[in-house]
């Protein structure tokens, strides 16, 4: 039994911190700031910001019917956890010229929770 417990402990320690700490309910609460401008539903419409349904694996600036900035359209980003976290930490600093007027997510735990929620809500 001790060997199994040790293997489990090693596995948990090797998991990325974001995966260990992610709380989708807290992420949904964090998304409250985002849903003023974004929807996540499959048939959701674009608001001030684009619909985020299916965002992971999608090329940035590619939602039909949304008027993106040239910076976003030409960024070459395909959204994954790293690119999303980098952008959401400092939207204006990470992509000068984009339109998103959001100061950024400043805390790692909030970011992990938000990403976990987005993965769940945007599939």
Where are the regions a protein language model picked out?
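Stable alpha-helical elements in mature extracytoplasmic
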Residues: 23, 30-33, 48, 80-83, ...
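C-terminal capping alpha-helices of c-type cytochrome domains
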Residues: 80-123
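Electrostatic cytochrome c docking/interface patches
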Residues: 14-31, 42
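Positively charged n-region of N-terminal signal peptides that target proteins for export
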Residues: 1-5
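Gly/Gly-Pro-rich "capping" loops immediately C-terminal to redox-active cysteine motifs
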Residues: 28, 39-80, 102
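Residues at helix-coil transition
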Residues: 15, 39, 57, 89, ...
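Bacterial N-terminal signal peptides
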Residues: 6-16
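The canonical Cys-X-X-Cys-His
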Residues: 32-40, 114, 118
């Amino acid at each position: 039994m001790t060997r199994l417990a040790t293997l489990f402990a090693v596995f948990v320690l090797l998991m990325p911190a974001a995966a260990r700490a992610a709380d989708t309910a807290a992420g949904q609460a964090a998304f409250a700031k985002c849903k003023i401008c974004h929807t996540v539903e499959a048939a959701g419409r674009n608001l001030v910001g684009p619909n985020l349904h299916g965002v992971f694996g999608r090329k940035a600036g590619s939602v039909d019917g949304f008027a993106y900035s040239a910076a976003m359209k030409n960024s070459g980003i395909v959204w994954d956890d790293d690119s999303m976290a980098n952008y959401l930490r400092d939207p204006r600093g990470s992509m000068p010229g984009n339109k998103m007027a959001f100061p950024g997510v400043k805390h790692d735990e909030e970011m992990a929770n938000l990403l976990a929620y987005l993965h769940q809500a945007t599939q």
